[in-house]
Amino acid sequence: RVSYEHDYESHGVVLGASRDYAKHNTTLSFNVMGSRDLAGRAGEIADAHEKVTVEVLDREGISAAGMGGLEAVSKGGQHVEPRLITLKYTGRGGGKVLGLVGKSVTFDTGGISIKPSGGMEEMKMDMSGGAAVLEALDAIASLDFAIDIIAVLPSTENMPSGTALKPGDIITQLNGKTVEVTNTDAEGRLILADAMVHCAREGADRIVDLATLTGAVLIGLGSTYAGLISNDDDLAGEIIAVGKRTGELVWRLPLHDEYKDLTKGTITDLVNASSQRKAGTIYAGSFLEEFTEGKPWAHLDIAGTAWDT
């Protein structure tokens, strides 16, 4: 927990500026804010703060690391330039290391399972989770909070092409679990899965991921509440309480074995999308729980709130 009990004015200026910068970056077109640009912004943050370091993997590094989800989603052509961005802030909090993971698909066409053309221009906002994580880290470092953080942004485009990921393809995620890809437009969970495992292996004790993950959360909660799914009551309770204080409201959705059963494959460990339309947000969260590495974890589906101004 971080205290805000002193110097409200300076805290407010920093937090407000970081929020506005995140929202600004979310509205930028892909040709202005692509994966390389996100990596560049991460580098700017690291250069500005001595307690922040950054490491960036390109396509070759992602493949060598065994991040099969991020690698597969990035197969939509040689112009796609994926990045795995890892920042570490060492504030010497002396407590548990917080992991933040932000989905950073800089443009999402849906891939071979292509989206309808109407409204597709808004899919530049599919990197909202990554934008939020980047600017949150910048604010935390600017305020010199006594907390240690690992932030991971899996960044790519989801594009159709002759080389793109196809329905029916089988991939192996970083933790060794196999996934049959039944819908290439359910790509966010594939890249988040690798990023969450990476975050845990880098030393995170607790993980919070932010992602514009499902349209289903918009149907269920609109743009007032973000969806929250968690395997840990204490962590979920902290997030709910902070949301009430700040106006960033969240609504907790359940995890249950019957939902988890829907994610199981017949020829693989998992399938990335269900043939059924029901409980889409919970399905995605249940899929992600397979990649927590046993850590307390919370998933925030911000598909409804990220684009709300």
Per-region residue spans from a language model:
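A generic structural signal for tightly packed, nonpolar segments enriched in small/aliphatic residues
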Residues: 7, 38-309
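Phosphate/ribose-phosphate-bearing ligand recognition and processing surfaces
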Residues: 1-52
